[in-house]
Amino acid sequence: MYTKDTIVAIATPQGNGGIGIIRISGIDALEIAEKLTKKQLKPRYATFCNVYNDNEIIDHGIVIFFKAPLSYTGEDVVEIQAHGNPFILNLIIKAALNCGARIAKAGEFTERAFLNNKLDLAQAEAVADIINASSEIAAKSAAKSLQGDFSKEINNLLEKLIYLRMYVEASIDFPEEEINFLEDQKIHSSLEEIYKVILAIKNSCKQGVILAEGITLILVGKPNAGKSSLLNALAGKESAIVTSIAGTTRDIVKEHIQINGVPMHIIDTAGLRNSDDIIESEGIKRAIKKIQEADQVLFVTDDYTNSQVKFSDIKEIIPEFYDQIPKDIDITYVHNKIDLLKEVPHNHANHIYISAENNIGIDKLKEHILNKVGYTNQNESIYTARERHVTAINNAFEHIKLAKEQLELGNGELLAEELLIVQEYLNSITGEFSSDDLLGEIFSSFCIGK
């Protein structure tokens, strides 16, 4: 068991509330709690009592003792449920510090749970994901990962992979056998099965990252093309000021919405043009910077002299900014104000025709946005995933393809080597093999009381 010193932190959000919870974990948790309460605490019993600093009553509330290893961290844990006043909670924290505890680092309770094998790394990350989920679907997906569904799938895959690798290595270790193990159909079928499972997990992880992190959309275009109207139409409310005056939006305007349960971070930017206005020029600089950070760019135009606008044509529309826009960025051309046209062109490829002011074509645009990122609404098979999970799975997928190539070539040693590499990438997801730097980066993103 992982045992160090004893840590303490407030486990509930900042601010006033009906209840505030203080969590203590470590080898001296019970001793400290009994000093604070002047009570003998029984495991898994809720004890109503006063909380003291020396002999001075700070508050009264409910105290619960969880004896190791039957606790969140796997250590002795005490939770004090007091009144949710920050001043009172901080007084209790100070009293605990005086008794020998120290303030917990961000994510340290969950880190201790991981180190004590109460959960694996993917489950630990799911704790943060379920706290930060910004949609119902994201919360449900995070809950599945927290329950271990994602880890079970990875572990089942690892079991098959390890068995196959052992079988392949046996064929290398016993070359005197007359049987050519590499021609055994069992190896071919097992490798193909593993390949298909990794591919399925790869697709599921991609969906999971979208749910966990959302999609960042940037609205760009010339002034008065209708970017702010489009932001309001997508958000379903008046988030940005809309006027007929070009250059109204001078700074970044952000809105967070959901499309079919997928979090969307929409950013409206200043219209791209040369301007002598210092404030507007600064807004335009920020717009260019945001374009480089986007998952998708919605280029809004009301110029119908060229309804087949392509990326190269942006040089004609905004020539002064053409060189500053990444050439490989995913751009959708949103042709606005179609209510002013006698005949409306059909949507095609990356060209969507709308009227933001009259809410025409907005649903088609939303559908297009989801299709562009490859999101499919298959909730049952989606787990909340991190970018590092996707990277690990993508790498595993590339090496399982190389393993198939080596099998076809009859290279047993290289096949075994590729299978080992795949195993290492999969192990990194659940934390079977993880560097201290990676663990520090993951747990530092948690809130203090978790």
Curated annotation (Swiss-Prot):
It is found in: Cytoplasm. GTP binds at residues 224-229, 243-249, 268-271. NCBIfam families: mnmE_trmE_thdF, PRK05291.1-3, small_GTP. Pfam families: MMR_HSR1, MnmE_helical, TrmE_N. This is tRNA modification GTPase MnmE. K(+) binds at N224, T243, I245, T248. It is an enzyme of class 3 (hydrolase). Keywords: Cytoplasm, GTP-binding, Hydrolase, Magnesium, Metal-binding, Nucleotide-binding, Potassium, tRNA processing. Exhibits a very high intrinsic GTPase hydrolysis rate. Involved in the addition of a carboxymethylaminomethyl (cmnm) group at the wobble position (U34) of certain tRNAs, forming tRNA-cmnm(5)s(2)U34. Homodimer. Heterotetramer of two MnmE and two MnmG subunits. Mg(2+) binds at S228, T249. GO terms for molecular function: GTP binding; GTPase activity; metal ion binding. The gene is mnmE. SUPFAM superfamilies: P-loop containing nucleoside triphosphate hydrolases, TrmE connector domain.
